[in-house]
Design a protein with these regions (language model features):
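Active-site phosphate-binding strand-loop segment of PLP-dependent enzymes
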Residues: 3-91, 96-104, 259
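Helix N-cap motif at beta-to-alpha junctions
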Residues: 102, 205-208
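Active-site-adjacent capping/gating segments
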Residues: 60, 67-76, 131-138, 189, ...
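Alpha-helical structural signal in soluble globular domains
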Residues: 14, 38-49, 174-178, 216, ...
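Short, amphipathic alpha-helical "lid/cap" segments that border enzyme active or binding sites
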Residues: 8, 155, 268-275
Length: 281
């Protein structure tokens, strides 16, 4: 939709037109900029069309829907978080997957460490399960383990997450109040959803050229980012993805979207400078 997350109305139309044997096995709901998708409606479609839901919550740690935190998997099968260096909390690199399904949990534990199984209840060779040292590999996987050092770094920051999200929310509220709405389309606020405000994405109005605006802000010392180049525009995927014209929403969004600075220690003086510079354009 216009905010970036998956359009439920568009998805409904696509699912209705899709033949039964071609229905998707899974839908990835991307909570772009930290704003949750409409997970309740998506869950209704999941029950009707029998697909899995994977939440991409790389931006959304600390976000919530009706006071329920993203990652609780109330509407999904899996939820994925990123702990990359620029995320709300970081372990340098890495991330985590949450699920509230026991079967999925045991499968993830197996896949994260070379496919190794140590749980006696899951071992196939039962006569050896009595030995404490015994383990099995029943399928190929890789080493996806986060180190103890990285984990300790992440855990130490979780205590600060509420503060980090609070500061981002204050900055976002100030931007929403002060940036000229006649010149820019600003993010929407929803009663039942709380954004983590990983990004603050604006879209220029009145035929303001986004590239010219980007260059203007750069000259003024304000770093902005274009989020994100559609996957099918990258050379490798151009050959893989056909009928790109059907992905017009991705193209339109990318051509308009511009992320302005938002991070916990962005002080009021810098916020005012960003607002003034934008409004004077």
């Amino acid at each position: 939709n216009e905010d970036g997350p998956l359009s439920i109305d568009y998805l409904k139309k696509k699912l209705q037109k899709t033949k039964k044997n071609n229905l998707p096995k899974a839908i990835i709901a991307v909570h772009i900029a930290g704003l949750p998708c409409d997970m309740e409606e998506l869950h209704k479609l999941k029950k009707k069309y029998k697909f899995k839901i994977i939440e991409d919550a790389s931006h959304a740690l600390g976000a919530s829907i009706k006071s329920k935190k993203i990652g609780s998997c109330n509407y999904s099968d899996f939820c994925i978080f990123s702990f990359h260096a620029i995320k709300s909390i970081t372990t340098g690199e890495g991330g985590c997957i949450t699920t509230n399904n026991k079967k999925n949990y045991h499968r993830l534990c197996q896949l994260r460490s070379h496919g190794i199984i140590r749980d006696k209840n899951l071992l196939k060779t039962k006569n050896l399960s009595k030995y404490h040292w015994y383990y099995e590999v029943n399928e190929i996987s890789f080493n996806f383990r986060l180190t103890d050092f990285q984990s300790a770094l992440g855990i130490s920051q979780i205590k600060k997450l509420k503060k980090f999200i609070g500061l981002r929310t204050q900055i976002a509220s100030y931007y929403l109040k002060k940036i000229d709405k006649k010149k820019f389309i600003l993010p929407k606020i929803y009663k039942d959803k709380k954004s983590a405000w990983h990004l603050f994405i604006i879209k220029p109005k009145n035929n303001i050229n986004r590239s010219n605006l980007y260059n203007y802000l750069k000259r003024k010392g304000i770093v902005t980012v274009l989020h994100y180049i559609p996957i099918f525009k990258h050379p490798y995927y151009k050959k893989k993805i056909k009928n790109q014209e059907r992905l017009i929403n991705s193209i339109n969004y990318f051509q308009q979207a511009l992320s302005i600075p938002i991070y916990p220690n962005l002080n009021k003086k810098k916020q005012n400078y960003i607002i003034k510079t934008l409004n004077n354009y």
